Each structure stands twice: as C-alpha cells, then as structure tokens.
C-alpha cells in the first residue's frame, strides 16, 4: 500500500510575543511562591498592554510565609527586563504594574488538601481532560514541525541577546510546513518568520539576518525555495510586543504542547502550581507517552486522562498507539497504572514538581526540552522505559 503523502504545519512564538510575556510573568509568580513554600497554591493570570501589566488570581501558602505584592510586581519587571523590552510603548522600568492577586477560595482549598473534603486524599484541583503525546520523528520524540519552529526562534533570540544584530526586537513568530511521506518528514515546503525590528531596517536586510539561522536549524538540503521563505510578509514590523497587541496568560496552548499534532484538553499551564492537573497531568501524560515510544512499544503514542475536582485518582486512562504499537494498548494502559501513580500527589512526587522550575517552561514549549540540573523538565526523562518494556512484554 503506498504511503500517504501530506503536508503538516506548526507554529511557534518567541519569548517577546505578548502572550508569552504574560505566560512568563505568571510562571515567575508561581516560582516565587514555590521558592518560599513548596506547597503553595497559585493561580495567577497576567494581562500586558502598552506600558501596563495587570496581575490577578488566587494564592495560598501553608507554612506562614508571605509573598508581598511588591515582590510579585518586582518579579514581573524582572521578566520583562530579561526579555529585553526597553521600548517607549513597553519598558520594564516605566510600565505600571497593577496587582489584584488575593487568597484562594476555601471551597477549592478543601478539595486539594489531604484530610479535607469529601475524599480525604489530596484531590485534583479541578475536573478536566489532559493529553500527552510522543512521536519518533525527531530525537526529542516531538513533531518535527514544532521542533524546527521553536528552534528558529530560540536561535534568533540568542542572536538578539548577543547584541550582534541590534536591529532585532523581542517579538517574533515562526511557522514551518513539512512534507510527509507516511509518518516521516521528507522536506520543507514553506517557512514563515515574522520578526519585530527597529525602524529603518528593510525587509531584505532582515531576510539576510534570518536566512542563515533557518538554514542552520533545518536538515541539510531542506531550505525551501526563496518564494516559500516568507519574512515579515506584511512589510515592516516595528510596533510589536504588548504595545502592538494585548497579551494574556494561556493563549498559546498549542505552541506550548504539540503544535497541533495531538489533541489538547483545553487547559493552559502557566500561572498554575502543580496541584492543578491541567498542568501536572499534562506533564505526566507526556512523560508516559515519551517513555512508551522510547521503550520501542510504539512509534507514536497519545494518552488521555480525566479527573474530577477533589478526587485523587484519574477517572479514566486511554492509550492510543495509532496502529504502531508492538503490544496491545490495554496491556500498555495496565502497565502505566501499575508503574505510575497518577494522583496529583503521585505526579508531583515522581516528577518533583514542587520546586520553582516553571520559568523556563513558559517560552519555546513545555515539551521536547532537555532535563536540567536544577530539576527542570523532569517529565522529559525516559527513565521509565525499561520498566514499561519489561512489564508489557
């Protein structure tokens, strides 16, 4: 049977994109609370617009520690400064910061605290469905379209921060279209990069800056025809960031996950402590799907879980290997249940999610990253692959 030929596209946005500015500020607040109390409950949203940042949400600490509004506001400024915003319309030092963060609802608290609520175990912070995914089309076990989209913007950000190309400003987006034969990418059909720049920089100058970065990211010989290499297709892009578009936490959930190659349960990650299963269970299902693929049990794997607020264990676990499985999906699902405690406490303990590790997740994707010495991206480890393989086989 001939392999199905098709195109697929994913996009990414840079750290300076207004929605990513908001995500990074929200996660800086999460890290601030967890650094003082690892059991903190945090749900903080950020809005950023022309020289203004607004913080709102609900928080609670359990060990008597206090995070002041001034500390939260300073964390927001530090994020904007690190990104590099020093423009008239959005400047880390000049922007106003409004803080409307207040205490967590007692009714929510009783559902997520051990020993309280109808069920005495620590329950999920909300109901919902979460998905994890992995594919062997890249070493990261991620969709190639998204990997390349992220890497293009990461390299451009490194170039901007180095000072070697002062014409680049923080806001940027990328998009990569690949040609697939069956499940394998075989070439690039189009690349789009929209990058904010200083006034007076021509489109051709910008193309000459961006072209070598794109070429370095893509496999050799995959650079698209010039007419399919789009740089700032509307012309100039001087007004950008929160001065050009209002940014909000949680609006880039497909960029954050699998670039459209897998389902999404709808819940955003940034601004949430790990008692929120929107975040922690999505990390756990990625960890499990990645380990299933790393174990050679499938070349593609999607996992869905569901939760009820206040209930510890997931209501359902679904494993789909998309016809690539080397074992029955029911056996794989059974092994997952045996090897990994998918309660909020079990996830948090296994993946060490109570640490202040969330800042780096808020730009360039939560998945496909390298686990760090500081405990970041623990869900990207493949240390469960051997046990999974043994149990399934």
Swiss-Prot record:
Q: Where does K(+) bind?
A: 45
The subcellular location is:
Cytoplasm
Q: Which residues are involved in binding Mg(2+)?
A: 19
Identify the stretch(es) annotated as Flexible loop: 104-114
Query: Which GO MF term does the entry hold, naming one?
Result: ATP binding
Q: Which coenzyme or cofactor does it need?
A: Mg(2+); K(+)
- Which amino acid positions bind ATP, per UniProt? 17, 171-173, 245, 251-252, 268, 272
**Pathway where this protein functions:** Amino-acid biosynthesis; S-adenosyl-L-methionine biosynthesis; S-adenosyl-L-methionine from L-methionine: step 1/1
Q: Which residues bind L-methionine?
A: 58, 104, 245, 276
Q: What is the role of this chain?
A: Catalyzes the formation of S-adenosylmethionine (AdoMet) from methionine and ATP. The overall synthetic reaction is composed of two sequential steps, AdoMet formation and the subsequent tripolyphosphate hydrolysis which occurs prior to release of AdoMet from the enzyme.
What quaternary structure, including any partners, is listed in this protein's UniProt entry? Answer: Homotetramer; dimer of dimers.
Q: Which family does it belong to?
A: Belongs to the AdoMet synthase family.
Protein name per the record:
S-adenosylmethionine synthase
Q: Which organism is it from?
A: Hyphomonas neptunium (strain ATCC 15444)
Q: Which gene encodes it?
A: metK
């Amino acid at each position: 049977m001939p392999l199905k030929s098709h195109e697929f596209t994913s996009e990414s946005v840079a750290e300076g994109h207004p929605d990513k500015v908001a995500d990074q500020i929200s996660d800086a607040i999460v890290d601030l609370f967890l650094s003082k109390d690892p059991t903190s409950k945090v749900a903080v949203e950020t809005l950023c617009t022309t020289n203004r940042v607004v913080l709102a949400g609900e928080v609670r600490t359990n060990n008597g520690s206090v995070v002041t509004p001034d500390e939260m506001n300073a964390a927001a400024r530090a994020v904007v400064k690190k990104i590099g915003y020093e423009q008239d319309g959005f400047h880390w030092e000049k922007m106003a910061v409004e803080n409307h963060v207040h205490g967590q609802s007692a009714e929510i608290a009783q559902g997520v605290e051990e020993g309280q609520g109808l069920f005495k175990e620590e329950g999920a912070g909300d109901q919902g469905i979460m998905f994890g995914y992995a594919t062997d089309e890249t070493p990261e076990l991620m969709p190639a379209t998204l990997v390349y989209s992220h890497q293009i913007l990461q390299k451009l950000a490194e170039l901007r921060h180095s000072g070697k190309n002062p014409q680049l400003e923080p806001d940027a987006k990328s998009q990569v279209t690949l040609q697939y034969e069956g499940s394998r990418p075989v070439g690039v059909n189009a690349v789009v990069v929209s990058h904010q720049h200083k006034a007076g920089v021509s489109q051709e100058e910008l193309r000459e800056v961006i072209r070598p970065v794109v070429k370095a990211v893509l496999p050799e010989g995959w650079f698209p025809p010039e007419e399919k290499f789009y740089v700032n297709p509307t012309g100039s892009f001087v007004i950008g960031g929160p001065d050009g578009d209002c940014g909000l936490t949680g609006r880039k959930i497909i960029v954050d996950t699998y670039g459209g190659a897998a389902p999404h349960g709808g819940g955003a990650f940034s601004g949430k402590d790990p008692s929120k299963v929107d975040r922690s269970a999505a990390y756990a299902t990625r960890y499990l799907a990645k380990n299933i693929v790393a174990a050679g049990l499938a070349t593609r794997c999607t996992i869905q879980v569901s939760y009820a607020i206040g209930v510890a264990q997931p209501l359902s676990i679904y494993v789909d290997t998309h016809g690539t499985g080397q074992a029955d999906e029911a056996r794989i699902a059974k092994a997952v249940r045996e090897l990994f405690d998918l309660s909020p406490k079990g996830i948090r303990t296994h993946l060490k999610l109570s640490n202040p590790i969330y800042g780096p997740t808020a730009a360039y994707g939560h998945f496909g990253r390298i686990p760090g010495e500081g405990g970041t991206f623990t869900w990207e480890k493949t240390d469960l692959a051997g046990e999974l393989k043994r149990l399934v086989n």
